[in-house]
Amino acid sequence: MSARGPAIGIDLGTTYSCVGVFQHGKVEIIANDQGNRTTPSYVAFTDTERLIGDAAKNQVAMNPTNTIFDAKRLIGRKFEDATVQSDMKHWPFRVVSEGGKPKVQVEYKGEIKTFFPEEISSMVLTKMKEIAEAYLGGKVQSAVITVPAYFNDSQRQATKDAGTITGLNVLRIINEPTAAAIAYGLDKKGCAGGEKNVLIFDLGGGTFDVSILTIEDGIFEVKSTAGDTHLGGEDFDNSMVSHLAEEFKRKHKKDIAPNKRAVRRLRTACERAKRTLSSSTQASIEIDSLYEGVDFYTSITRARFEELNADLFRGTLEPVEKALRDAKLDKGQIQEIVLVGGSTRIPKIQKLLQDFFNGKELNKSINPDEAVAYGAAVQAAILIGDKSENVQDLLLLDVTPLSLGIETAGGVMTPLIKRNTTIPTKQTQTFTTYSDNQSSVLVQVYEGERAMTKDNNLLGKFDLTGIPPAPRGVPQIEVTFDIDANGILNVTAADKSTGKENKITITNDKGRLSKDDIDRMVQEAERYKSEDEANRDRVAAKNAVESYTYNIKQTVEDEKLRGKISDQDKNKILDKCQEVINWLDRNQMAEKDEYEHKQKELERVCNPIISKLYQGGPGGGGGSGASGGPTIEEVD
């Protein structure tokens, strides 16, 4: 454990998140205040407060338009992205565009607010950080955060920014399947048998990754990775929701689509049915008064569910084939197939995968919901210098998921770094001018596998100016690509003759939050946090005065006190209690000090009378009323 306190590992998921810490030589996956080891990645805004996690998900049907989830499907993407546009059809909340970036729009405390996906994710991260702090009994400053292996550069950078907004020092961004491989590898430590080829099949709530690693003596080397950053359990839910909404329309001639609350209740029922279908062959759905007073009772079979998602399920095998090709391995050379992510519990997916590998047994030894956070916690411990023997000789060699290069004449993509190159890495290539006396070159950086840049993703661009006039082909411009351990790219271009250089951290110029934006969001996050705390204190003060009032009322109405308290005193207390109860009904939203003041007012009336009780019945004892209530003394 370092002097800075422990570092945590956070699996920031599309639908659920999970946090772990490595201490005393083992990983603890930390339960939240509800006792759950995973926390919904949900943030809700109401007239009075902001809710995160279980509390947010539990009220989603009552407040569908202001409850945000799936931020991971927005993060690092542009508003025009086809996936964003198609997701918006399923989301009950509003997504708007600001400078080409998507933002969610909600009503909070009576005002319209908009948030970037990074801000929503940072709220979920804040919740995970607080869960860890409650368990560890102290502040947490540093964390390793995981992302899908197939996340591109902008999605990685945006996730890192979310961590910064939370106030965390993000030690490293690591890939989810790699983190899961650590969990698997540590679990198997000490088993004999040298190098092992392991395929991690990670299908979660919103993303899908396949990674192939070789594991030997604590060295985890990723050979290839493939996936789909937009495929997961949510998509299987969507198929069922559409199917059942159609059935409702057929049976009852009513379309529930415009009613967001009805759609949300149907989605919750579908999610539950989907889980049931992993262990049973049929699930019943019963929703009272789904729409316009009509109950919806139906059932769905496992076979029907599999048919609705047949294409999506089959589609999970394509990345498996691609990863095998890239790793130059035959499927017979894979020794272990490890399942990660909640959606791998679906029997059909297990069957397809097992059949693809000619009936080979799948490895289900690690917890699919917790493995990623487990691995992240181990990596966090290594990065802060934990000296436990279990993690000392552990080495992670990860890869970049997409080829990176620049545009050359004619819109051709010239890759400098090929996909599945081990990171960190640095590659330099020399380019030259295209026309005589050209004084500047535009360096445009792309990621992707297509031959022409127009089909790939532009990460950013910059000019290198001041090139001395010369015939075409003479100047030598050296372009260097440097990828750090987070998988984030830096590019420099230098003119060899003048030594002039220009550089850019590809943190996606177009989509990236500026430093000022991030600083502003850090302050806002602090402000929201203190507002949340103030609200918690306010509610506590309200509850305190409420319970005090009812307790006092019960006390004086108790039969046992008959004859010990005069009717006049009793009525005085009961009248005051009733007055406070009426005031509370009218002032549910008062400030903390108003509640405290009300409680003091009530105490001023009650304490002298209650003290008299303790001093021997009506009028007994000369206890002064100003003593401020009963004091307790030790009896010898």
Curated annotation (Swiss-Prot):
Residues covered by region (Disordered): 613-636
UniProt modified residues of type N6,N6,N6-trimethyllysine: K564
Q: Show the segment(s) annotated as Substrate-binding domain (SBD).
A: 397-512
GO terms for biological process?
cell differentiation; chaperone cofactor-dependent protein refolding; protein refolding; response to cold; response to heat; spermatogenesis
Any one Pfam family here would be: HSP70
Q: Which GO terms describe its molecular function?
A: ATP binding; ATP hydrolysis activity; ATP-dependent protein folding chaperone; heat shock protein binding; protein folding chaperone
Biological role: Molecular chaperone implicated in a wide variety of cellular processes, including protection of the proteome from stress, folding and transport of newly synthesized polypeptides, activation of proteolysis of misfolded proteins and the formation and dissociation of protein complexes. Plays a pivotal role in the protein quality control system, ensuring the correct folding of proteins, the re-folding of misfolded proteins and controlling the targeting of proteins for subsequent degradation. This is achieved through cycles of ATP binding, ATP hydrolysis and ADP release, mediated by co-chaperones.
Any domain commentary?
Answer: The N-terminal nucleotide binding domain (NBD) (also known as the ATPase domain) is responsible for binding and hydrolyzing ATP. The C-terminal substrate-binding domain (SBD) (also known as peptide-binding domain) binds to the client/substrate proteins. The two domains are allosterically coupled so that, when ATP is bound to the NBD, the SBD binds relatively weakly to clients. When ADP is bound in the NBD, a conformational change enhances the affinity of the SBD for client proteins.
What protein family does this chain belong to? Belongs to the heat shock protein 70 family.
The protein, known as: Heat shock-related 70 kDa protein 2
State the species of origin.
Answer: Bos taurus
**What taxonomic classification does the UniProt entry list for its organism?**
Eukaryota, Metazoa, Chordata, Craniata, Vertebrata
Source gene? HSPA2
